[in-house]
Amino acid sequence: MGSKIVSDANAFVKFLKLCQDESKDNCTYMDDVSVLLVKKEQLLHDIIGEKNQPIFICEKAQTKYEPEATETSADTSDVEDVLFKVEQDPGPQPLSIMKARQLLSWYTMAHNPNMSRLKAPENLHPLWVRCDKSDPCATAWLGVEITYSGNKTSGVKLYTVCCKGPTGDETAFTTLDELKQEHQNRHHTSAVSTKGYAQYNLFCSLTEESLMFESQSSVIASLTWNHVEKMLECPPLSSKATLNIKVAVGDIRSPLYQTYREMEFLLALAGGLRTGEIEWLEPVETQSAVDLTRALIEELENLAHGVPGHSAKASEKQKAKPDAAFSSMVIERGDLDFTEQLWEKMRKSVTSYQDITECMKIVVKAVKLGKIKPWIHKDSNSTLSKLILQSYQQQIDSVPLTGLAPANMLLELGLDKIRKDFINYLVGKELTTLNYLSYYLDTEVDLQEQVVRVRKLHHLLEILGTCSTFLSLPHERLFLFTQSCLQYYKTSNYDEDHIFQLQIKPALISYFYEKEQPFSWAVEVSSGQGSKEVKTSLYLSDKPLVDHIHLDLDVSLNESVNGDSEKMFYYRTMVSCSLINFI
Protein backbone atom coordinates (compact mmCIF):
# COMPACT_ATOMS: atom_id res chain seq x y z
CA MET A 1 0.00 0.00 0.00
CA GLY A 2 1.35 3.42 -0.92
CA SER A 3 2.98 5.38 1.87
CA LYS A 4 0.87 8.42 0.91
CA ILE A 5 -2.39 6.56 1.60
CA VAL A 6 -1.06 5.25 4.92
CA SER A 7 0.11 8.71 5.93
CA ASP A 8 -3.21 10.31 4.96
CA ALA A 9 -5.24 7.70 6.84
CA ASN A 10 -3.14 8.04 10.00
CA ALA A 11 -3.33 11.83 9.86
CA PHE A 12 -7.12 11.78 9.44
CA VAL A 13 -7.90 9.48 12.39
CA LYS A 14 -5.43 11.35 14.62
CA PHE A 15 -7.25 14.56 13.71
CA LEU A 16 -10.59 12.96 14.64
CA LYS A 17 -9.17 11.79 17.96
CA LEU A 18 -7.91 15.30 18.71
CA CYS A 19 -11.37 16.75 18.01
CA GLN A 20 -12.94 14.07 20.22
CA ASP A 21 -10.54 14.52 23.15
CA GLU A 22 -10.86 18.30 23.09
CA SER A 23 -14.64 18.14 22.49
CA LYS A 24 -14.38 20.52 19.56
CA ASP A 25 -17.78 21.04 17.94
CA ASN A 26 -16.44 22.16 14.58
CA CYS A 27 -12.98 21.68 13.07
CA THR A 28 -11.68 22.11 9.53
CA TYR A 29 -9.56 19.37 7.97
CA MET A 30 -7.31 20.14 5.00
CA ASP A 31 -9.19 23.40 4.31
CA ASP A 32 -12.09 21.74 2.48
CA VAL A 33 -13.70 19.40 5.04
CA SER A 34 -15.60 20.50 8.14
CA VAL A 35 -15.69 17.91 10.91
CA LEU A 36 -18.55 18.33 13.38
CA LEU A 37 -18.78 16.46 16.66
CA VAL A 38 -22.50 16.17 17.44
CA LYS A 39 -24.45 14.39 20.14
CA LYS A 40 -27.43 13.79 17.88
CA GLU A 41 -28.23 14.56 14.25
CA GLN A 42 -32.02 14.38 14.36
CA LEU A 43 -32.80 13.44 10.74
CA LEU A 44 -30.01 10.86 10.71
CA HIS A 45 -31.16 9.56 14.08
CA ASP A 46 -34.68 9.08 12.73
CA ILE A 47 -33.57 6.73 9.96
CA ILE A 48 -30.65 4.89 11.56
CA GLY A 49 -32.28 4.24 14.91
CA GLU A 50 -31.22 4.49 18.52
CA LYS A 51 -27.59 5.48 18.83
CA ASN A 52 -26.64 6.79 22.23
CA GLN A 53 -23.15 7.99 21.39
CA PRO A 54 -21.86 11.13 19.66
CA ILE A 55 -20.87 10.96 16.00
CA PHE A 56 -18.55 12.76 13.62
CA ILE A 57 -20.19 14.44 10.65
CA CYS A 58 -18.05 15.49 7.71
CA GLU A 59 -19.33 18.06 5.25
CA LYS A 60 -17.99 20.62 2.83
CA ALA A 61 -16.22 23.49 4.55
CA GLN A 62 -18.02 26.72 3.79
CA THR A 63 -16.01 29.67 2.59
CA LYS A 64 -16.45 32.62 4.87
CA TYR A 65 -17.26 35.72 2.89
CA GLU A 66 -14.95 38.55 3.82
CA PRO A 67 -15.82 41.81 2.10
CA GLU A 68 -13.02 43.63 0.40
CA ALA A 69 -11.91 46.95 1.82
CA THR A 70 -13.84 49.76 0.15
CA GLU A 71 -13.67 53.50 0.13
CA THR A 72 -15.79 55.25 2.73
CA SER A 73 -17.77 56.81 -0.07
CA ALA A 74 -18.86 53.44 -1.42
CA ASP A 75 -22.32 53.23 -2.89
CA THR A 76 -25.06 52.21 -0.43
CA SER A 77 -26.20 49.38 -2.71
CA ASP A 78 -22.72 47.81 -2.48
CA VAL A 79 -22.91 47.85 1.32
CA GLU A 80 -26.37 46.25 1.26
CA ASP A 81 -25.08 43.58 -1.12
CA VAL A 82 -22.22 42.78 1.25
CA LEU A 83 -24.59 42.53 4.22
CA PHE A 84 -26.90 40.25 2.25
CA LYS A 85 -24.06 37.86 1.41
CA VAL A 86 -22.82 37.81 5.00
CA GLU A 87 -26.28 37.08 6.42
CA GLN A 88 -27.06 34.28 3.98
CA ASP A 89 -26.85 30.81 5.56
CA PRO A 90 -26.72 28.12 2.88
CA GLY A 91 -27.01 25.37 5.50
CA PRO A 92 -24.90 22.21 5.55
CA GLN A 93 -23.16 21.45 2.27
CA PRO A 94 -22.33 17.94 0.99
CA LEU A 95 -19.03 16.52 -0.21
CA SER A 96 -18.59 14.64 -3.48
CA ILE A 97 -19.13 10.89 -3.43
CA MET A 98 -15.45 10.37 -4.25
CA LYS A 99 -14.31 12.49 -1.30
CA ALA A 100 -16.78 10.78 1.04
CA ARG A 101 -15.52 7.33 0.05
CA GLN A 102 -11.94 8.45 0.60
CA LEU A 103 -12.70 9.60 4.16
CA LEU A 104 -14.52 6.36 4.97
CA SER A 105 -11.69 4.27 3.51
CA TRP A 106 -9.14 6.09 5.69
CA TYR A 107 -11.29 5.50 8.78
CA THR A 108 -11.87 1.83 7.90
CA MET A 109 -8.24 1.03 7.03
CA ALA A 110 -6.97 2.62 10.22
CA HIS A 111 -9.21 0.33 12.29
CA ASN A 112 -8.20 -2.85 10.44
CA PRO A 113 -5.86 -4.79 12.77
CA ASN A 114 -4.37 -6.50 9.71
CA MET A 115 -2.95 -3.17 8.55
CA SER A 116 0.29 -3.11 10.55
CA ARG A 117 1.34 0.34 9.38
CA LEU A 118 -1.99 1.88 10.42
CA LYS A 119 -3.17 2.37 13.98
CA ALA A 120 -6.49 3.99 14.86
CA PRO A 121 -6.98 5.56 18.29
CA GLU A 122 -9.25 3.59 20.61
CA ASN A 123 -12.97 4.34 21.07
CA LEU A 124 -13.30 6.64 18.08
CA HIS A 125 -16.86 7.81 17.45
CA PRO A 126 -18.72 6.64 14.30
CA LEU A 127 -18.16 8.70 11.15
CA TRP A 128 -20.86 10.02 8.82
CA VAL A 129 -20.33 12.03 5.63
CA ARG A 130 -22.87 14.18 3.80
CA CYS A 131 -22.88 13.31 0.07
CA ASP A 132 -24.12 15.18 -2.99
CA LYS A 133 -26.09 12.23 -4.49
CA SER A 134 -24.18 12.59 -7.76
CA ASP A 135 -23.92 8.80 -8.20
CA PRO A 136 -26.62 6.66 -9.90
CA CYS A 137 -27.99 5.58 -6.49
CA ALA A 138 -28.46 9.20 -5.34
CA THR A 139 -26.40 8.63 -2.18
CA ALA A 140 -27.01 11.31 0.47
CA TRP A 141 -25.06 9.82 3.39
CA LEU A 142 -22.22 7.37 3.87
CA GLY A 143 -21.45 6.14 7.37
CA VAL A 144 -19.17 3.75 9.21
CA GLU A 145 -19.05 2.40 12.75
CA ILE A 146 -16.81 -0.15 14.43
CA THR A 147 -18.00 -3.59 15.56
CA TYR A 148 -16.33 -5.44 18.39
CA SER A 149 -15.76 -9.01 19.53
CA GLY A 150 -15.21 -8.62 23.24
CA ASN A 151 -12.76 -5.74 23.55
CA LYS A 152 -11.21 -6.25 20.13
CA THR A 153 -12.15 -4.58 16.87
CA SER A 154 -13.75 -7.25 14.69
CA GLY A 155 -14.96 -5.24 11.71
CA VAL A 156 -17.01 -2.29 10.51
CA LYS A 157 -20.56 -1.61 9.43
CA LEU A 158 -20.82 0.56 6.34
CA TYR A 159 -24.07 2.46 5.83
CA THR A 160 -25.49 3.95 2.65
CA VAL A 161 -28.47 6.32 2.63
CA CYS A 162 -30.03 6.99 -0.78
CA CYS A 163 -32.85 9.48 -1.38
CA LYS A 164 -35.34 10.20 -4.14
CA GLY A 165 -37.85 13.00 -4.57
CA PRO A 166 -41.54 12.70 -3.73
CA THR A 167 -44.00 10.80 -5.87
CA GLY A 168 -47.62 9.78 -5.50
CA ASP A 169 -47.22 6.85 -7.89
CA GLU A 170 -47.10 3.72 -5.73
CA THR A 171 -45.86 1.66 -8.68
CA ALA A 172 -42.64 3.67 -8.43
CA PHE A 173 -42.00 2.38 -4.91
CA THR A 174 -39.63 -0.47 -4.28
CA THR A 175 -41.76 -3.53 -3.52
CA LEU A 176 -41.35 -5.57 -0.36
CA ASP A 177 -40.09 -8.55 -2.38
CA GLU A 178 -37.50 -6.34 -4.08
CA LEU A 179 -36.36 -5.01 -0.72
CA LYS A 180 -36.01 -8.53 0.67
CA GLN A 181 -34.10 -9.61 -2.43
CA GLU A 182 -31.77 -6.61 -2.09
CA HIS A 183 -31.03 -7.60 1.50
CA GLN A 184 -30.53 -11.28 0.70
CA ASN A 185 -28.18 -10.55 -2.20
CA ARG A 186 -26.10 -8.20 -0.08
CA HIS A 187 -25.85 -10.44 2.98
CA HIS A 188 -26.17 -13.94 1.44
CA THR A 189 -28.92 -15.03 3.77
CA SER A 190 -32.31 -16.61 3.26
CA ALA A 191 -33.70 -16.09 6.78
CA VAL A 192 -34.97 -12.54 7.17
CA SER A 193 -37.50 -10.82 9.40
CA THR A 194 -39.53 -7.69 8.72
CA LYS A 195 -40.74 -4.89 10.91
CA GLY A 196 -43.12 -2.07 10.05
CA TYR A 197 -43.40 1.50 11.31
CA ALA A 198 -46.16 4.03 10.67
CA GLN A 199 -47.04 7.48 11.96
CA TYR A 200 -50.39 9.22 11.64
CA ASN A 201 -51.41 12.75 12.54
CA LEU A 202 -54.73 12.06 14.21
CA PHE A 203 -55.83 15.69 14.06
CA CYS A 204 -55.86 15.36 10.28
CA SER A 205 -58.65 12.80 10.51
CA LEU A 206 -61.09 15.53 11.60
CA THR A 207 -63.12 17.21 8.87
CA GLU A 208 -64.77 19.99 10.85
CA GLU A 209 -64.58 23.45 9.34
CA SER A 210 -62.95 24.67 12.55
CA LEU A 211 -59.77 22.90 11.49
CA MET A 212 -59.19 25.78 9.12
CA PHE A 213 -57.60 27.41 12.15
CA GLU A 214 -53.91 26.63 12.35
CA SER A 215 -53.05 24.76 15.53
CA GLN A 216 -49.74 24.26 17.30
CA SER A 217 -51.13 21.13 18.96
CA SER A 218 -50.63 17.66 17.57
CA VAL A 219 -51.51 14.07 18.36
CA ILE A 220 -49.22 11.67 16.53
CA ALA A 221 -49.88 7.93 16.64
CA SER A 222 -46.70 5.87 16.22
CA LEU A 223 -47.20 2.17 15.53
CA THR A 224 -44.75 -0.72 15.11
CA TRP A 225 -45.43 -4.32 14.14
CA ASN A 226 -43.71 -7.46 12.87
CA HIS A 227 -44.29 -9.52 9.74
CA VAL A 228 -44.97 -6.84 7.14
CA GLU A 229 -46.81 -8.19 4.10
CA LYS A 230 -46.89 -5.25 1.70
CA MET A 231 -45.83 -1.65 1.26
CA LEU A 232 -47.97 0.98 3.01
CA GLU A 233 -50.08 -1.66 4.73
CA CYS A 234 -52.28 -0.47 7.58
CA PRO A 235 -50.84 -1.48 10.97
CA PRO A 236 -52.62 -4.55 12.40
CA LEU A 237 -54.41 -4.39 15.75
CA SER A 238 -51.56 -6.46 17.22
CA SER A 239 -49.20 -3.49 16.75
CA LYS A 240 -47.56 -1.59 19.57
CA ALA A 241 -48.97 1.93 19.61
CA THR A 242 -47.83 5.13 21.28
CA LEU A 243 -49.56 8.49 21.26
CA ASN A 244 -47.22 11.47 21.11
CA ILE A 245 -49.25 14.39 22.42
CA LYS A 246 -48.27 18.04 22.23
CA VAL A 247 -50.87 20.60 23.25
CA ALA A 248 -50.58 24.36 23.00
CA VAL A 249 -53.07 26.28 25.11
CA GLY A 250 -55.31 28.93 23.58
CA ASP A 251 -56.80 26.91 20.70
CA ILE A 252 -60.31 28.32 20.19
CA ARG A 253 -61.54 24.80 19.34
CA SER A 254 -60.57 23.53 22.79
CA PRO A 255 -63.32 22.79 25.31
CA LEU A 256 -61.14 24.71 27.77
CA TYR A 257 -60.93 27.93 25.80
CA GLN A 258 -62.84 29.93 28.42
CA THR A 259 -60.54 28.55 31.11
CA TYR A 260 -57.62 29.68 28.97
CA ARG A 261 -59.04 33.23 28.90
CA GLU A 262 -59.30 33.16 32.68
CA MET A 263 -55.70 31.92 32.98
CA GLU A 264 -54.64 34.58 30.51
CA PHE A 265 -55.81 37.32 32.87
CA LEU A 266 -54.26 35.59 35.89
CA LEU A 267 -50.88 35.35 34.12
CA ALA A 268 -51.05 38.97 32.97
CA LEU A 269 -51.79 40.12 36.51
CA ALA A 270 -49.01 37.97 37.99
CA GLY A 271 -46.59 39.18 35.33
CA GLY A 272 -47.44 42.80 36.10
CA LEU A 273 -46.80 42.27 39.81
CA ARG A 274 -43.51 40.56 39.03
CA THR A 275 -42.11 43.00 36.46
CA GLY A 276 -43.98 46.22 37.16
CA GLU A 277 -45.38 46.29 33.62
CA ILE A 278 -48.73 44.90 32.51
CA GLU A 279 -50.73 44.90 29.30
CA TRP A 280 -54.37 44.80 30.37
CA LEU A 281 -56.67 42.51 28.41
CA GLU A 282 -59.62 43.90 26.48
CA PRO A 283 -62.56 43.94 28.95
CA VAL A 284 -65.38 41.50 28.27
CA GLU A 285 -67.99 43.42 30.26
CA THR A 286 -69.44 46.72 29.05
CA GLN A 287 -69.89 47.99 32.62
CA SER A 288 -66.89 49.22 34.60
CA ALA A 289 -65.30 47.06 37.27
CA VAL A 290 -66.39 49.51 39.98
CA ASP A 291 -70.04 49.46 38.83
CA LEU A 292 -70.07 45.65 38.69
CA THR A 293 -68.59 45.43 42.19
CA ARG A 294 -71.14 47.88 43.58
CA ALA A 295 -73.93 45.90 41.92
CA LEU A 296 -72.68 42.67 43.52
CA ILE A 297 -72.55 44.31 46.97
CA GLU A 298 -76.03 45.79 46.47
CA GLU A 299 -77.40 42.41 45.46
CA LEU A 300 -76.04 40.84 48.66
CA GLU A 301 -77.43 43.70 50.76
CA ASN A 302 -80.88 43.29 49.20
CA LEU A 303 -80.72 39.56 49.79
CA ALA A 304 -79.81 40.11 53.44
CA HIS A 305 -82.75 42.51 53.86
CA GLY A 306 -85.13 40.16 52.07
CA VAL A 307 -85.91 42.50 49.18
CA PRO A 308 -88.22 40.61 46.74
CA GLY A 309 -86.90 39.76 43.30
CA HIS A 310 -83.27 39.44 44.31
CA SER A 311 -81.32 36.20 44.68
CA ALA A 312 -77.63 35.48 44.84
CA LYS A 313 -76.21 34.13 41.66
CA ALA A 314 -74.76 30.72 42.29
CA SER A 315 -72.36 30.84 39.43
CA GLU A 316 -70.98 32.77 36.52
CA LYS A 317 -70.71 29.88 34.15
CA GLN A 318 -68.84 30.30 30.92
CA LYS A 319 -69.68 27.60 28.47
CA ALA A 320 -67.39 26.38 25.74
CA LYS A 321 -68.20 27.53 22.23
CA PRO A 322 -71.05 25.40 20.87
CA ASP A 323 -69.27 24.98 17.55
CA ALA A 324 -66.06 23.65 19.10
CA ALA A 325 -64.51 20.74 17.22
CA PHE A 326 -64.38 18.81 20.48
CA SER A 327 -67.36 17.85 22.59
CA SER A 328 -67.90 19.65 25.88
CA MET A 329 -65.63 19.31 28.90
CA VAL A 330 -67.10 21.26 31.80
CA ILE A 331 -64.54 22.71 34.22
CA GLU A 332 -66.65 25.54 35.67
CA ARG A 333 -68.54 24.90 38.89
CA GLY A 334 -72.03 25.88 39.99
CA ASP A 335 -71.08 26.68 43.60
CA LEU A 336 -69.09 29.91 43.27
CA ASP A 337 -68.83 31.75 46.58
CA PHE A 338 -68.72 35.54 46.97
CA THR A 339 -64.96 35.91 46.42
CA GLU A 340 -65.13 33.76 43.29
CA GLN A 341 -68.02 35.77 41.88
CA LEU A 342 -66.03 38.93 42.62
CA TRP A 343 -63.03 37.49 40.75
CA GLU A 344 -65.22 36.64 37.76
CA LYS A 345 -66.60 40.17 37.53
CA MET A 346 -63.26 41.90 38.04
CA ARG A 347 -61.21 39.77 35.64
CA LYS A 348 -63.64 40.62 32.85
CA SER A 349 -63.68 44.34 33.49
CA VAL A 350 -60.59 45.81 35.19
CA THR A 351 -58.29 47.89 33.01
CA SER A 352 -55.97 49.44 35.61
CA TYR A 353 -54.53 49.03 39.08
CA GLN A 354 -56.79 51.92 40.09
CA ASP A 355 -59.83 49.81 39.15
CA ILE A 356 -58.60 46.99 41.39
CA THR A 357 -57.92 49.32 44.31
CA GLU A 358 -61.35 50.99 44.08
CA CYS A 359 -63.14 47.64 43.90
CA MET A 360 -61.26 46.23 46.89
CA LYS A 361 -61.99 49.36 48.93
CA ILE A 362 -65.72 48.99 48.22
CA VAL A 363 -65.72 45.33 49.28
CA VAL A 364 -63.58 45.75 52.41
CA LYS A 365 -65.69 48.72 53.55
CA ALA A 366 -68.92 46.72 53.12
CA VAL A 367 -67.46 43.82 55.10
CA LYS A 368 -66.12 46.03 57.92
CA LEU A 369 -69.43 47.87 58.27
CA GLY A 370 -71.30 44.58 58.37
CA LYS A 371 -73.38 45.48 55.30
CA ILE A 372 -72.69 42.04 53.86
CA LYS A 373 -71.86 38.69 55.42
CA PRO A 374 -71.36 36.63 52.28
CA TRP A 375 -70.95 32.88 52.13
CA ILE A 376 -67.46 31.63 51.28
CA HIS A 377 -65.88 28.20 51.01
CA LYS A 378 -64.43 27.10 54.35
CA ASP A 379 -61.10 26.15 52.75
CA SER A 380 -60.62 29.52 51.02
CA ASN A 381 -57.12 30.84 51.58
CA SER A 382 -57.15 34.42 50.28
CA THR A 383 -56.68 37.55 52.38
CA LEU A 384 -60.22 38.70 51.55
CA SER A 385 -61.70 35.32 52.54
CA LYS A 386 -59.94 35.47 55.90
CA LEU A 387 -61.27 39.00 56.41
CA ILE A 388 -64.82 37.82 55.72
CA LEU A 389 -64.41 34.91 58.15
CA GLN A 390 -63.24 37.39 60.81
CA SER A 391 -66.30 39.54 60.15
CA TYR A 392 -68.52 36.68 61.31
CA GLN A 393 -66.96 37.15 64.77
CA GLN A 394 -66.83 40.98 64.58
CA GLN A 395 -63.01 40.80 64.83
CA ILE A 396 -61.54 42.31 61.67
CA ASP A 397 -57.83 42.96 61.16
CA SER A 398 -56.61 46.06 59.39
CA VAL A 399 -56.05 45.47 55.67
CA PRO A 400 -53.67 47.75 53.71
CA LEU A 401 -55.20 48.88 50.43
CA THR A 402 -52.30 50.90 49.05
CA GLY A 403 -49.64 50.19 46.45
CA LEU A 404 -49.83 46.70 44.96
CA ALA A 405 -51.64 45.13 47.93
CA PRO A 406 -55.10 45.19 46.22
CA ALA A 407 -53.65 43.57 43.08
CA ASN A 408 -52.09 40.84 45.21
CA MET A 409 -55.47 40.31 46.87
CA LEU A 410 -57.09 39.89 43.45
CA LEU A 411 -54.38 37.44 42.38
CA GLU A 412 -55.12 35.39 45.51
CA LEU A 413 -58.81 35.29 44.59
CA GLY A 414 -57.99 34.03 41.10
CA LEU A 415 -55.62 31.35 42.37
CA ASP A 416 -58.18 30.16 44.93
CA LYS A 417 -60.99 30.00 42.39
CA ILE A 418 -59.01 28.31 39.59
CA ARG A 419 -57.50 25.74 41.95
CA LYS A 420 -60.99 24.75 43.10
CA ASP A 421 -62.13 24.47 39.47
CA PHE A 422 -59.26 22.12 38.68
CA ILE A 423 -59.70 20.05 41.86
CA ASN A 424 -63.41 19.75 41.13
CA TYR A 425 -62.70 18.26 37.71
CA LEU A 426 -59.66 16.08 38.42
CA VAL A 427 -60.89 14.62 41.70
CA GLY A 428 -64.54 14.63 40.67
CA LYS A 429 -63.72 12.61 37.55
CA GLU A 430 -61.56 10.28 39.70
CA LEU A 431 -58.48 11.03 37.63
CA THR A 432 -56.34 11.66 40.70
CA THR A 433 -56.52 12.35 44.44
CA LEU A 434 -55.86 15.40 46.60
CA ASN A 435 -52.71 13.68 47.83
CA TYR A 436 -51.30 13.53 44.28
CA LEU A 437 -52.21 17.20 43.82
CA SER A 438 -50.53 18.43 47.02
CA TYR A 439 -47.54 19.90 45.16
CA TYR A 440 -49.83 21.95 42.91
CA LEU A 441 -52.13 23.11 45.73
CA ASP A 442 -49.44 24.22 48.18
CA THR A 443 -50.26 27.75 49.39
CA GLU A 444 -47.15 28.03 51.57
CA VAL A 445 -44.97 28.95 48.57
CA ASP A 446 -45.01 32.55 47.32
CA LEU A 447 -47.75 33.78 44.98
CA GLN A 448 -45.59 33.74 41.85
CA GLU A 449 -44.66 30.08 42.42
CA GLN A 450 -48.33 29.27 43.03
CA VAL A 451 -49.12 30.81 39.63
CA VAL A 452 -46.45 28.64 37.98
CA ARG A 453 -47.92 25.47 39.48
CA VAL A 454 -51.51 26.36 38.60
CA ARG A 455 -50.35 27.08 35.05
CA LYS A 456 -48.89 23.57 34.87
CA LEU A 457 -52.23 22.13 36.02
CA HIS A 458 -54.00 24.12 33.33
CA HIS A 459 -51.70 22.66 30.66
CA LEU A 460 -52.38 19.19 32.03
CA LEU A 461 -56.13 19.80 31.77
CA GLU A 462 -55.74 20.97 28.17
CA ILE A 463 -53.95 17.69 27.42
CA LEU A 464 -56.67 15.67 29.16
CA GLY A 465 -59.27 17.64 27.22
CA THR A 466 -57.68 16.44 23.99
CA CYS A 467 -57.50 12.84 25.20
CA SER A 468 -60.99 12.61 26.66
CA THR A 469 -63.09 14.66 24.26
CA PHE A 470 -61.26 14.31 20.95
CA LEU A 471 -59.83 10.79 21.34
CA SER A 472 -62.54 9.51 23.73
CA LEU A 473 -59.99 7.47 25.67
CA PRO A 474 -61.33 5.22 28.45
CA HIS A 475 -61.03 6.25 32.09
CA GLU A 476 -58.33 3.71 32.97
CA ARG A 477 -55.97 5.13 30.34
CA LEU A 478 -56.76 8.72 31.36
CA PHE A 479 -56.12 7.88 35.02
CA LEU A 480 -52.64 6.44 34.39
CA PHE A 481 -51.79 9.21 31.95
CA THR A 482 -52.83 11.86 34.49
CA GLN A 483 -50.48 10.42 37.12
CA SER A 484 -47.65 10.39 34.58
CA CYS A 485 -48.19 14.04 33.63
CA LEU A 486 -48.51 15.15 37.25
CA GLN A 487 -45.24 13.43 38.08
CA TYR A 488 -43.49 15.02 35.09
CA TYR A 489 -44.48 18.57 36.00
CA LYS A 490 -43.36 18.17 39.62
CA THR A 491 -39.74 18.33 38.47
CA SER A 492 -39.94 19.99 35.05
CA ASN A 493 -40.50 23.54 33.87
CA TYR A 494 -43.67 24.58 32.07
CA ASP A 495 -43.24 23.59 28.43
CA GLU A 496 -45.95 23.56 25.76
CA ASP A 497 -43.48 21.99 23.31
CA HIS A 498 -42.97 18.92 25.48
CA ILE A 499 -44.32 15.75 23.91
CA PHE A 500 -46.21 13.56 26.37
CA GLN A 501 -46.31 9.86 25.48
CA LEU A 502 -49.10 7.40 26.16
CA GLN A 503 -48.96 3.67 25.40
CA ILE A 504 -52.30 2.56 24.03
CA LYS A 505 -54.07 -0.33 22.34
CA PRO A 506 -54.43 0.27 18.58
CA ALA A 507 -58.10 -0.73 18.74
CA LEU A 508 -58.82 2.43 20.76
CA ILE A 509 -57.55 4.72 18.00
CA SER A 510 -57.95 2.63 14.82
CA TYR A 511 -61.06 4.63 13.93
CA PHE A 512 -58.84 7.67 13.37
CA TYR A 513 -56.15 6.13 11.18
CA GLU A 514 -57.51 3.08 9.38
CA LYS A 515 -58.84 5.15 6.47
CA GLU A 516 -56.03 7.71 6.54
CA GLN A 517 -52.66 7.74 4.84
CA PRO A 518 -49.63 7.82 7.16
CA PHE A 519 -47.35 10.83 6.90
CA SER A 520 -44.46 8.45 7.59
CA TRP A 521 -44.22 4.73 6.85
CA ALA A 522 -41.21 2.40 6.91
CA VAL A 523 -40.28 -1.24 6.61
CA GLU A 524 -37.12 -2.83 7.90
CA VAL A 525 -35.68 -6.14 6.65
CA SER A 526 -33.11 -7.63 9.02
CA SER A 527 -30.98 -10.70 9.62
CA GLY A 528 -28.30 -11.71 12.11
CA GLN A 529 -28.12 -10.92 15.81
CA GLY A 530 -26.25 -8.58 18.13
CA SER A 531 -23.27 -6.87 16.52
CA LYS A 532 -23.78 -9.12 13.49
CA GLU A 533 -27.29 -7.81 12.83
CA VAL A 534 -27.70 -6.01 9.52
CA LYS A 535 -30.72 -4.14 8.17
CA THR A 536 -32.08 -2.83 4.90
CA SER A 537 -34.82 -0.23 5.31
CA LEU A 538 -37.13 1.83 3.15
CA TYR A 539 -38.73 5.03 4.46
CA LEU A 540 -41.69 6.80 2.86
CA SER A 541 -42.25 10.27 4.33
CA ASP A 542 -44.11 13.46 3.53
CA LYS A 543 -40.94 15.47 4.24
CA PRO A 544 -37.36 14.81 3.09
CA LEU A 545 -35.16 12.97 5.59
CA VAL A 546 -32.05 14.82 4.44
CA ASP A 547 -31.46 18.55 4.71
CA HIS A 548 -28.35 19.15 2.61
CA ILE A 549 -29.56 18.34 -0.90
CA HIS A 550 -32.49 19.34 -3.10
CA LEU A 551 -34.91 16.59 -4.11
CA ASP A 552 -36.96 17.21 -7.25
CA LEU A 553 -40.63 16.32 -7.41
CA ASP A 554 -40.74 12.97 -9.20
CA VAL A 555 -44.02 13.65 -11.02
CA SER A 556 -45.14 15.32 -14.20
CA LEU A 557 -46.38 18.92 -14.06
CA ASN A 558 -49.75 17.82 -15.43
CA GLU A 559 -50.20 15.27 -12.64
CA SER A 560 -49.17 17.73 -9.93
CA VAL A 561 -51.68 20.31 -11.19
CA ASN A 562 -54.61 18.09 -12.13
CA GLY A 563 -54.02 15.09 -9.90
CA ASP A 564 -56.07 13.94 -6.95
CA SER A 565 -55.53 16.39 -4.09
CA GLU A 566 -56.07 13.55 -1.59
CA LYS A 567 -53.07 11.62 -2.89
CA MET A 568 -50.08 11.55 -0.56
CA PHE A 569 -46.69 12.28 -2.11
CA TYR A 570 -43.82 10.45 -0.42
CA TYR A 571 -40.09 11.06 -0.34
CA ARG A 572 -38.25 7.73 -0.57
CA THR A 573 -35.20 6.99 1.55
CA MET A 574 -33.33 3.68 1.35
CA VAL A 575 -30.87 2.70 4.08
CA SER A 576 -28.59 -0.29 3.50
CA CYS A 577 -25.86 -1.74 5.65
CA SER A 578 -22.80 -3.88 4.86
CA LEU A 579 -20.83 -5.82 7.47
CA ILE A 580 -17.09 -6.19 6.84
CA ASN A 581 -15.23 -8.56 9.16
CA PHE A 582 -11.52 -8.07 9.85
CA ILE A 583 -11.07 -11.29 11.82
Swiss-Prot record:
Subunit-level organization: Component of the RZZ complex composed of kntc1/rod, zw10 and zwilch.
Function per UniProt: Essential component of the mitotic checkpoint, which prevents cells from prematurely exiting mitosis. Required for the assembly of the dynein-dynactin and mad1-mad2 complexes onto kinetochores.
Compartments where found: Chromosome, Centromere, Kinetochore
Annotated GO biological process: cell division; mitotic spindle assembly checkpoint signaling; protein localization to kinetochore
Chief localisation class: nucleus
Protein name, UniProt field: Protein zwilch homolog
Keywords: Cell cycle, Cell division, Centromere, Chromosome, Kinetochore, Mitosis
Any one annotated GO CC term: RZZ complex
Keyword Cell division listed: yes
Family: Belongs to the ZWILCH family.
